[in-house]
Amino acid sequence: GSEMCIRDRKNVPQMLKAYICREAYQERLTPDSLYVNLRNLENWAKSEQNPVSKAILHSLLAREYADYMRYNRQLLSGRTALDTDEAPADIREWSSNIFVTKVDEHNLASLQDSVRLLEVSSKEYVPFVVLEDGSRFYGHDMYHLLAARAVDTYLLLDGFRADSLQRMRIAGIYEGMINTYRHRAGAEDATVLATLDYWKWKRTGSGISREPYATYRERKAQVDKEYLGALDNLIREYGAREICAEAYICKADLLRNMGASHMDEALQTCDE
């Protein structure tokens, strides 16, 4: 089981598999085992020489810290923020802002060596159950896997007063991905998908919905207009590729949502 994999220190691929399985099946660790895990992983990440293994360990650490916060939400909500530079040695005494900083540090570190991560296939690291449809178009590279994990981990910071950090980092990850794939030979499909994922997040998960209604309507109209422009650019640039069907579908949906004035255009999009 996952315990065994974690003890086998040299085997990072197995360990990542164990963690991803645990997440997929939503098995929860007890706070005590999380606590022990975090200390072991921290020591290992410091000493690991292989850059890809190191990146994976950072990704796992970010997620474990975020999980630890969520388990202890009640406890942390009553704590006064401590100075980040003077974090107590024992994480059981930390305040939530220190955890947020840790999650952020490890997420950033996990994506630092993007060039190297692009060269590594994620297949040997990922249990089959998790290679969902999306990643086959991304070519199963490790960079995409860790970037997607970092986004998910930042999303776990909801409710910990980290909204602006969360938005800034997630936008940065998507923009970095789009830029990276755009400049990489043979990564057209990944470029299209990263762009669609980015906009999906931007329209649903980037905090627009928390604004007062009048502001929200204006912002949403603005974002929808930008989204339409982005879809048109994708279609213009990659329209001949099979993957671009996704962009056509998104465009038809968007026009339908934008209202009747755009219906004619929506029908025309479907005909294309």
Language-model segment annotations:
Residues 189-191, 204-272:
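Extracellular polysaccharide-recognition and catalytic grooves
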Residues 12-25, 54-76, 120-162, 185-212, ...:
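Amphipathic alpha-helical repeat scaffolds of TPR domains
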Residues 167-177:
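Amphipathic alpha-helical segments within extended alpha-helical solenoids and repeat-rich scaffolds
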Residues 28-48, 68-133, 155-168, 204-229, ...:
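Short coil/linker segments at helix-helix boundaries
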